[in-house]
Amino acid sequence: FPPNTAQRWTLANGMTLIVQEDRSAPVASVQAWCATGSTTEDKHLGAGLSHILEHMLFKGTKTRSTNEIAQKIQDVGGYINAYTSFDRTVFWIDVPKEGALTALDILADAMMNSTLPPQEYAKEQEVIRREFAMGMDDPDRTMTHLLFATAYQRHPYRLPVIGLIDIYNQLTQEQVMEYYKRRYVPNNLTFIVVGDIVLAEVREKLENLFKDQPAK
């Protein structure tokens, strides 16, 4: 493995930044890690709040529609994806190096300014219901859920990340928005950028994007 030359620092609002220059290929990966997952859903434990929020964060912000977000990523030749786990939700955009700052802009916008449009929420509710149905038809997934439910009878690990369908069906868009505002805050976020980038440019961009975002 190449030597680890990553630099890490923390902004005044508590957000962590990790950046590493790597010139081995003309690409970059821009990631946002939020320290929130299925075990941090408090009174909504088992509802899959973190998972549906993962689906919703690129469905529109205060300044961009879902189509505009998708078009911006396409324009720079990027690939966007995300996943939810027990204790984290991770979003990433892989781009040619020229698109790194654009990817940062879009990710920061989604982390801080998502609007979770009700019409998009209704669509994603159905998408996730289909995920539930597919999971029920998957013996490996069923076995994993049963294993965790047996091994962690009191700990939140006993519940699947996607949630339980009966609790999930009770969720409202307003509850998801409240969770988003509470958990997606600078002091709960880590931005990671690795690739053929200029560290000073990335740092300046991130500091400017989050300079008006206070810790909560």
Stretch-by-stretch model annotation:
Residues 1-13:
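Beta-lactamase-like hydrolase cores
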Residues 4-5, 28, 178:
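Residue-level marker for the onset of beta-strands and adjacent loop->beta junctions
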